[in-house]
Amino acid sequence: MSSMRLVLDTNVWLDWLVFDDPGIAPVQAAVAAGHADIVIDAVCEDELIRVLGYPLQKWTLDAMRQSACLEQCRHVACRIDIQYTMALPQCDDPDDQKFLELAAGTQAACLITKDRALLALARHLPPLPFHIVTPAEFSALQ
């Protein structure tokens, strides 16, 4: 079985790295079993670094914990610099466009998100060459 390529948005990364959200378990299991690979680019990684420095609900991460989260991300994800060439729909939130670009540019199977605008985009457009799904919906695709 070949592995599927995945893109995670920043909030899903936070669920994995900071919040230990059990909802991300299907994605973690697919990666651990070698059924999925996660890709990230410099733009998405920069956003993750920035957000790790914000107060996150009841967590404020000190520099050591931020560094550990980033190292875990870099251990799990493959850093890829991409050039996307296909025409993509425009997100309502311009900050989310980078995730569509990364998914398209890396020929990902799925963009995994809980962002309502991205999920609505997937429902209201002609099919994209990748799925935009929640972590729970991802488990149904496997």
Feature locations, PLM:
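Short, hydrophobic alpha-helical packing/hinge segments within bilobed ligand-binding/sensory domains
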Residues: 27, 99-100
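Short secondary-structure boundary segments
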Residues: 42-43, 114-116
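Short, active-site-adjacent cap segments at secondary-structure transitions
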Residues: 13-14, 46-47, 118-120
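Short, flexible loop segments at the rims of nucleotide/cofactor-binding pockets, characterized by
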Residues: 15-16, 86-92
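Acidic, PIN/NYN-like endoribonuclease modules and their adjacent C-terminal/linker elements
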Residues: 89, 93, 97, 104-110, ...
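PIN-domain endoribonuclease scaffold, especially VapC-family toxins
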Residues: 30-86
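Short, well-structured N-terminal submotif of metal-dependent ribonuclease cores
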Residues: 1-40
